Amino acid sequence: MEKVESFELDHRKVKAPYIRKCCLLDGKCGDKVTKFDIRFLQPNKEEFGTAAMHGLEHLLAHELRAKLEGIIDLSPMGCRTGFYLSIWGDREASEIKEALEYSLEKVLEAKEIPAANDIQCGNYRDLSLFGAKEYAKEALERGFSLNIYGE
């Protein structure tokens, strides 16, 4: 059985916030998909509140698409310390960092959360614009490293 990539990462050694290129997947038809670990919070020490994380997910899913072509999905991590970004092509973490910083600045300017209704969202009552902005502000202040060990 194939190993789960994220379970192979020693979460005790990483230093958040960071952006990590997890893997490059090669499809049977020559297509490529890159997966990134966008870690906002320190594993096993911090975690997002669900409403803030859910709000940030909606906002980033919307804003990142203005800067990055080929986004497949932005998915919250079950541990609530960050997000996974899947995108078409062989992409680099530096490109993701630039787009993420732009998008987080846009989050700070947001007046509402996109798709915050019962038609477009399966849990629209659990969203926090205030919380999303607080995490965006903190992440921008701390800065995202491209070195997961913070060196």
Swiss-Prot record:
Its cofactor is Fe cation. Its EC number is 4.4.1.21. The keyword Disulfide bond does not apply. Keywords: Autoinducer synthesis, Iron, Lyase, Metal-binding, Quorum sensing. The keyword Transit peptide does not apply. Homodimer. PANTHER family: S-RIBOSYLHOMOCYSTEINE LYASE (PTHR35799:SF1). Belongs to the LuxS family. This is S-ribosylhomocysteine lyase. It comes from Clostridium botulinum (strain Alaska E43 / Type E3). The lineage of its organism: Bacteria, Bacillati, Bacillota, Clostridia, Eubacteriales.
